[in-house]
Amino acid sequence: LFRKGPMTMPPSTLGAFAKSDPSQKSANLEWHVQPLSLDKFGEPLHTFNAITPSVLNLRPTSRGWIRAASSDPLEYPKILCNYLSTKEDLDVAVAGMKITRNIMSSKALESFQPEEILPGTSVKTDKDLENEAKNLGTTIFHPIGTCAMGKVDGQGVAEDPMTVLDSECRLRGVSKLRVIDASAMPSIPSGNTNAP
C-alpha cells in the first residue's frame, strides 16, 4: 500500500472524454494517459521520462468476428478484430490524434517541452494519420458483442441476423443456456466495460 515504483500504480493515471467534432451528441473519444512510454504493449518501457496519451473511439462502427476453428472445443477460435475498417472509425481516429496533438502543444504543457515520438511529427496529412492509426492502433482490452443480444420473436427469429441471444440472455437454438457477460452487449458502453 505504501510502496513506490511503476508497479504500485495503475497503468493509466488520467482519463478524459471529448467529442471528435461538435456534431456528436456526447463524447465519443476517451483518453487513457500513462506516465510511461513504449514502442508497443509487451515491449520494454523507454528509459526517458514520458507520458503516453492513448485516444480511443467510444462508439466504433467496425465489426469483426469470432468463429470456431474446428469441432474441438479446446482449440482456440479464429478471431478477426477488424479495427478501423470503416471510414467513420478512421475519421474519429484522425480527429482524436489531432486533438491529442493540440493538447500536447498547449500553453499549459509548454514548460514540459513535450516531444512527439509516435506517430511522429513527420506524419502530417489526414491520410498519413489514418495509416499510422492502422499501424499503431490496438485493443484497450474491453471486447464485447461476440454473443450479441437482440430482439427475437416467438418463433426464435431475430430482427438482426447477428443476434445470438434473446432479451433474456438465452442462446438461440440451445436450451437451458444463457450468456451473462460482456459478450452479450450489442454495443460497447462508453467508459469501458468494467465501470461504465
Where are these regions (language model features)?
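FAD-dependent oxidoreductase catalytic-site/capping-region signature
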Residues: F2-P196
